[in-house]
UniProtKB/Swiss-Prot annotation:
Tissue expression as described in the entry: Highly expressed in thymus and liver.
Organism: Bos taurus (Bovine)
Keyword NADP: no
Main subcellular location of this protein, as a coarse class: secreted
Boundaries of every Collagen-like domain copy: 46-216
Annotated disulfide bonds: C275-C369, C347-C361
Protein name, UniProt field: Collectin-46
Chain's gene name: CL46
Keyword Repeat: yes
Length: 371
């Protein structure tokens, strides 16, 4: 009877892992020999005893070493797409790609601004007459032309309306003295004359009445001066209006100089003669202001003009007609060059923009006189 408790106690003192193995061994031994552990009676004809009660749970054993990692599991399915992250920095510039094919030509661009007006070309030879064009619109009224030949008297027309007063004309020449008029009324007393020579002392005369004050003569002189000043002012105003009328529309005034043109086109020598007959000379601009005044007349007539300067005496040395050297010049680029297919260029023309060029003196150009 004591062997059973001892067997149970022996089992409880064994580790759990070895317990299972021992139990398996004991089971096998029991099958081989039922009384190996428990001896009750001789094996012959004896019955096995009842199972004993389970023993108490033993103390927890020490934590074993970690096992070797198992094989990696299969990759799971991709999760849903996350929110779009912030824009990353630009990457470095890539290598330039190959040059593409030339594209088709683009549409024509807008017309550019008009360029500067070039210098006037040389006058070409007269071409053949063209076919008459259609009748144009009535143009503006032109300036007064030269007086024509007197025609035969026409029939008397209807009386026209009274015209507007004309501009003040130039002072006319003195006419023939008319017949003497009737004697007018006596005028005011004239100014006192100069004193005469001192005479001999005469006899004392009677005491006369008190004379008038000498201030009357002074006041009369002042009044006369005031009248003369008024007349002078009226003459100056009239001359100013006359000067404007003479200059309009083909004249320019700069300082004390007046530049005037009648629109004539002549050679250099004929142009000089025309200005001399008008008591002037060919235009001789001596400053930028005078040069611009001449250029304005050139633009108004749309024709280049002669200037008075030339190098007829000494090639390459341009002077005024008096022989004086130039004090101002405005040559175009590359001028003067004396280059006209062998024909000397000894005279000066002024372009519309005010630049100068040397030309043959025989070329017909606009005449502008200086007064």
């Amino acid at each position: 009877m004591l062997l059973l408790p001892l067997s149970v106690l022996l089992l409880l003192t064994q580790p759990w892992r070895s317990l299972g193995a021992e139990m398996k061994i004991y089971s096998q031994k029991t099958l081989a020999n039922g009384c190996t552990l428990v001896v009750c009676r001789p094996p012959e004809g004896g019955l096995p005893g009842r199972d004993g009660q389970d023993g108490r749970e033993g103390p927890q054993g020490e934590k074993g070493d970690p096992g070797s990692p198992g094989p990696a599991g299969r990759a799971g399915r991709p999760g849903p797409a996350g929110p779009i992250g912030p824009k990353g920095d630009n990457g470095s510039a890539g290598e330039p790609g190959p040059k593409g094919d030339t594209g088709p030509p683009g549409p024509p661009g807008m017309p550019g601004p008009a360029g500067r007006e070039g210098p006037s070309g040389k006058q070409g030879s007269m071409g053949p007459p063209g076919t008459p064009g259609p009748k144009g619109d009535t143009g503006p009224k032109g300036g007064m032309g030269a007086p024509g030949m007197q025609g035969s008297p026409g029939p008397a027309g209807l009386k026209g309306e009274r015209g507007a007063p004309g501009e003040l004309g130039a002072p006319g020449s003195a006419g023939v003295a008319g017949p003497a008029g009737a004697i007018g009324p006596q005028g005011p007393s004239g100014a006192r004359g100069p004193p005469g020579l001192k005479g001999d002392r005469g006899d004392p005369g009677e005491r006369g009445a008190k004379g008038e004050s000498g201030l009357a003569d002074v006041n009369a002189l002042k009044q006369r001066v005031t009248i003369l000043e008024g007349q002078l002012q009226r003459l100056q105003n009239a001359f100013s209006r006359y000067k404007k009328a003479v200059l309009f529309p083909d004249g320019q005034a700069v300082g004390k100089k007046i530049f005037k043109t009648a629109g004539a086109v002549k050679s250099y020598s004929d142009a000089q003669q025309l200005c001399r007959e008008a008591k002037g000379q060919l235009a001789s601009p001596r400053s930028a202001a005078e040069n611009e005044a001449v250029a304005q007349l050139v633009r108004a007539k749309n024709n280049d003009a002669f200037l008075s300067m030339n190098d007829i005496s000494t090639e390459g040395k341009f002077t005024y007609p008096t022989g004086e050297s130039l004090v101002y010049s405005n040559w175009a680029s590359g001028e003067p060059n004396n280059n006209n297919a062998g024909q000397p260029e000894n005279c000066v023309q002024i372009y519309r923009e005010g630049k100068w060029n040397d030309v043959p003196c025989s070329e017909p150009l606009l005449v502008i006189c200086e007064f």
